[in-house]
Swiss-Prot record:
Lineage: Eukaryota, Metazoa, Chordata, Craniata, Vertebrata
Gene: ENHO
Biased composition (Pro residues): 52-65
One GO BP: positive regulation of Notch signaling pathway
Organism the protein comes from: Bos taurus (Bovine)
Reported function: Involved in the regulation of glucose homeostasis and lipid metabolism.
The protein's name in its UniProt record: Adropin
UniProt keyword list: Secreted, Signal
């Protein structure tokens, strides 16, 4: 029975390793595709400045929340 447990553990470790490796590979491919596409868009944007930013736009700044500090100054 000990051999069956170690074999099951070995299979689980191998499967988890394969899944982790495939996820890492997918992440690398997506990042590479995103960077290469943004580089192509950057080179195209020099000739056409009105082009869209594409699927990987730069991070926009967070929207400004209305500040309630000093709002009493606006009231009469």
């Amino acid at each position: 029975m000990g051999a069956a447990l170690s074999q099951g553990a070995l299979i689980a470790i191998i499967c988890n390793g394969l899944v982790g490796f495939l996820l890492l590979l997918l992440w690398v491919i997506l990042c590479w595709a995103c960077h290469s596409r943004s580089a192509n868009i950057d080179s195209l944007s020099e000739s056409s400045p009105n082009s869209s930013p594409g699927p990987c736009p730069e991070k926009a700044p967070p929207p400004q929340k209305p500040s309630h500090e000093g709002s009493y100054l606006l009231q009469p």
